[in-house]
């Protein structure tokens, strides 16, 4: 299967489960990242990231701008796929000026760690795991669909974590500084909220 067909297949799959609304036909460019051997995803810097737990590793990105795809910095660190952008020397204004819409789609066989920060949006479907660690901060949002035995959730600085469609037995959650966490639990909950 070539990269373009794999991207179309993943986009169609994400569309069928409601993670994305349309197949990205208006995007001018797409890119496949040859990365594997990760069990977590960390999204930063306002990127939109869709994750499907599936049979194989597949990391693709689409954008209105081929330049934006070249500015993506996607790598594996400590078994976590880190999805971000390269910093430019021009500071915030240069980053803002060059921040065209970029959508990253990931397929991976198993998942145990999710992180989002700096306004990133992380939508995850097909989760079926024993334990899941979730960390959201700085205005980011994480939504997870599937089932899991237990989860540890930390949300801060205006972040949102939506687990209403994740069947959980037990969870430990900590929300601070205007963050919110929505959980669907069947057994036990341990939580802390501040600020």
Language-model regions, residue ranges each:
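Bacterial N-terminal signal peptides that target proteins for export
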Residues: 2-13
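Intrinsically disordered, low-complexity segments enriched in Ser/Pro/Gly/Ala and basic residues
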Residues: 15, 24, 117, 136-139, ...
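Acidic (Asp/Glu) and glycine-rich low-complexity loops/linkers
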Residues: 11-16, 24-117, 121-135, 145-152, ...
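Short, surface-exposed interaction patches in beta-rich subdomains
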Residues: 144-195
């Amino acid at each position: 299967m070539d990269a373009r067909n794999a991207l179309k297949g993943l986009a169609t799959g994400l569309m069928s489960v409601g993670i994305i609304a349309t197949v990205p036909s208006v995007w001018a460019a797409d890119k496949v990242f040859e990365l594997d051997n990760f069990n977590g995803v960390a999204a930063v810097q306002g990127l939109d990231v869709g994750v499907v737990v599936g049979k194989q590793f597949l990391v693709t990105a689409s954008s209105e701008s081929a330049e934006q795809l070249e500015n993506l910095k996607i790598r594996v660190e400590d078994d976590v796929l880190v999805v971000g952008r390269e910093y430019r020397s021009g500071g915030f204004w240069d980053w803002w000026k060059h921040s065209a819409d970029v959508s990253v789609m990931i397929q991976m066989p198993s998942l145990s760690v999710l992180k989002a920060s700096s306004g990133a949006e992380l939508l995850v479907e097909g989760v079926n795991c024993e334990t899941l660690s979730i960390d959201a901060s700085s205005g980011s949002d994480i939504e997870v669909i599937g089932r899991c035995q237990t989860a540890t959730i930390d949300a801060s600085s205006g972040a949102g974590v939506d687990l209403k469609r994740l069947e959980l037995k037990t969870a430990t959650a900590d929300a601070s500084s205007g963050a919110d966490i929505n959980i669907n639990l069947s057994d036990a909950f341990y939580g802390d909220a501040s600020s």
